């Protein structure tokens, strides 16, 4: 029965890509409750303050942005509304955290990826299921889905009760360079959004997935302030370039390094 529900949820996710890109994380529409079973909420263990998002990639592992690291945080899986709990929500602590050992700590954009091992495996359910690592790199022009509990207004931050979703496009790096002269090829990032502005991830969407043509291709990393500016699309960590590192860590090779 759980398998049937998981397959149904994945179908909803696929259908979401057929929608027009009129849904905004900034001032936009709520995600369907069944389209994000892999979405994880990271929050401060003491205050309960929401910190970041993440993505469940198997029963024991979550992928997020390195800049989301915090001393004391918990992870909530299977969540949708902050006020109304799903019956199958589960909470986990980080058992181990892995950041690329060759990351330049003074560069936020460099290797902005963190792999978290949960203190115990989660049980898959109607609202909890993984998102697989990408089998191939994304193509420029791909339709991509963004989602998160981050701000839905660009300047004065306004946070929604449920995650908001939007469709954007994967852009050529050349189109992003004018807005981000600090962006270097070795940062291994993707650029995605709408060049005229108005559709974007925003504050506290960090760590959430960029899903292009159904594949987990990026992690929300960086962007302009205020959010949604023209010529300033979002910057995402390119997950495909870290596949080998992720798989090595999960297999037990905790000394593995990322590509330069």
UniProtKB/Swiss-Prot annotation:
Enzymatic reactions: Selective cleavage of Arg-|-Xaa bond in fibrinogen, to form fibrin, and release fibrinopeptide A. The specificity of further degradation of fibrinogen varies with species origin of the enzyme
Tissue: Expressed by the venom gland.
Coiled coil, from the record: none
A matching Pfam family: Trypsin
GO cellular component: extracellular region; secretory granule
PROSITE patterns reported in the protein's UniProt record: TRYPSIN_DOM (PS50240), TRYPSIN_HIS (PS00134)
Subcellular location(s) per record: Secreted
GO molecular function: serine-type endopeptidase activity; toxin activity
Protein's GO biological process: proteolysis
Domain Peptidase S1 residue range list: 25-251
Leader sequence residues: 1-18
Residue ranges listed under propeptide: 19-24
Function: Thrombin-like snake venom serine protease that clots fibrinogen (FGA) by releasing fibrinopeptide A. According to PubMed:8585090, only cleaves rabbit fibrinogen, whereas no specificity is described in PubMed:3910643 (tests done on bovine fibrinogen). Also acts as a C3 convertase that independently cleaves human C3 and kick-starts the complement cascade. Also increases urokinase-type plasminogen activator (PLAU) and plasminogen activator inhibitor (SERPINE1) in cultured bovine pulmonary artery endothelial cells. Dose-dependently inhibits collagen-induced platelet aggregation.
Subunit (UniProt): Monomer.
Protein name as it appears in the record: Thrombin-like enzyme flavoxobin
Organism: Protobothrops flavoviridis (Habu)
